[in-house]
């Protein structure tokens, strides 16, 4: 369905669209100065008037591609990029938003680099139990690879048993500026731990971050923040890789295997994905809590993560869906990249000691969101397979 951030990266609507003649004439039709991307420009101007676009998920149209088509090769119409960037820049100007339109990560795609208003502070919340090697790698990557200086890190200690862990904590303030440790004494409950850490946060934005994350991109914090600051955005997620350079997370899809799954999971790092989805900003119903930025005001207003029904699993998706149900957008950006060493600190949910808890939380999730799991994810066509996250047809 309509995904506003995706439309700012490429004209995914393409050729077939229906709109009122009166509105078309009111807008003056197509603009010659955007020739080559005149349809993209028109869609942006139409949506400025209507607030969105309806979508029919049925297959009603086939595009016969020939050698001169835009899709026939990235050099088929070399003037298209300039026209598209003008259309996007004019759209930002008309809507009163500030940012720079740039070439995207792949030909025929684009990026809006949003200006950040003021100097907002980000509070990074990192739960930890022992595993100081992972935590050290995480912390070092944050300080060595960030172009945003106004942040604090709150390590949330939870029942470590190794004395070396506490000795390690003592070294943090002298090695990492504005880094402190707070102590959560209860049993492991990912939601409660993050909610506890958030009570100490001073920033206008919170970044929930697993201790097994290693930041890769230098504009990591700035990129996440540039979306989180927008009033229409609820949560922002990053592009996460497994250590073997395959995709771990690129947005969350509802309905995968009876619950939810990660878009393009296990695709190669270099893949562009279905219709450039891996290399363009996307709107999804949810993003993973392994790396999730949100406004502190929203986090508090929505009660943080659900400690009762989703102590460990699905709390991130539940939080995002609550935001989405209130009309906020959840965003995946491919320009905030990191490795995710997947749940090293507590073991995978398939292990016997976690299986019962996981199944209980999965049942809670299905009971609450059955309508989206069984019938409807606006960002995943119903003709796509719901057994895998690969955008393959059923």
What are these regions (language model features)?
Residues 206:
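Short aromatic/hydrophobic "clamp" motif used to bind/position activated sugar donors
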Residues 131-146:
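Short, well-formed alpha-helical segments that are part of the catalytic scaffolds
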Residues 1-22, 34-35, 191-192, 255-297:
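A recurrent flexible, glycine/aromatic-enriched loop bordering the glycosyltransferase active site
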Residues 23, 33-59, 88, 220-224, ...:
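A short, conserved alpha-helix in the catalytic core of glycosyltransferases
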Residues 184-201:
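Glycine-rich, basic loop-to-helix element that forms the pyrophosphate-binding segment
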Residues 143-183:
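Acidic donor-binding segment of Leloir-type glycosyltransferases
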Residues 76-122, 234, 244, 256-284, ...:
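C-terminal, non-catalytic tails of nucleotide-sugar-dependent glycosyltransferases
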Residues 1, 213-259:
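Conserved donor NDP-sugar-binding/catalytic core segment of glycosyltransferases
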């Amino acid at each position: 369905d309509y995904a506003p951030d995706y439309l700012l990266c490429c004209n995914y609507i393409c050729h077939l669209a229906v709109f009122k003649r009166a509105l078309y004439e009111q807008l003056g039709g197509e603009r010659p100065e955007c020739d080559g991307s005149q349809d993209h420009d028109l869609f942006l101007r139409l949506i400025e008037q209507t607030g969105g676009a309806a979508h029919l998920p049925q297959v009603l149209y086939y595009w016969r591609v020939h050698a001169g088509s835009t899709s026939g090769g990235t050099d088929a119409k070399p003037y298209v990029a300039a026209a598209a960037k003008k259309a996007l820049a004019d759209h930002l100007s008309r809507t009163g938003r500030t940012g720079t339109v740039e070439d995207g990560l792949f030909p025929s795609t684009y990026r809006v680099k949003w200006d950040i208003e003021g100097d907002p502070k980000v509070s990074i919340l990192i739960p930890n139990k022992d595993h100081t090697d992972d935590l050290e790698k995480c912390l070092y990557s944050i300080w060595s690879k960030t172009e945003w200086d106004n942040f604090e890190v709150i390590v949330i200690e939870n029942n470590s048993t190794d004395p070396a862990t506490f000795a390690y904590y003592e070294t943090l303030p002298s090695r990492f500026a504005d880094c402190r440790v707070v102590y959560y004494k209860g049993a492991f409950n990912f939601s409660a731990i993050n909610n506890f850490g958030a009570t100490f946060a001073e920033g206008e934005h919170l970044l929930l971050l697993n201790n097994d994350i290693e930041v890769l991109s230098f504009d990591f914090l700035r990129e996440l923040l540039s979306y989180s600051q927008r009033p229409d955005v609820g949560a922002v997620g990053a592009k996460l890789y497994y250590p073997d350079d395959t995709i771990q997370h690129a947005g969350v899809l509802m309905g995968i295997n009876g619950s939810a799954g990660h878009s393009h999971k296990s695709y190669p790092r270099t893949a562009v994905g279905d219709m450039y989805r891996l290399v363009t900003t996307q709107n999804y119903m949810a993003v993973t809590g392994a790396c999730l930025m949100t406004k502190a005001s929203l986090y508090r207003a929505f009660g943080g993560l659900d400690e009762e029904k989703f102590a460990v699993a699905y709390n991130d998706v539940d939080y995002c869906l609550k935001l989405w149900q209130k009309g906020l957008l959840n965003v995946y950006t491919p320009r905030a990249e990191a490795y995710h060493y997947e749940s090293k600190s507590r073991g995978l949910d398939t292990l016997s000691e976690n299986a019962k808890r996981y199944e209980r939380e999965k049942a809670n999730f299905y009971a609450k969101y059955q309508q989206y799991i069984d019938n409807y994810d606006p960002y995943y066509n119903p003709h796509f397979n719901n057994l895998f996250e690969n955008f393959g047809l059923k």
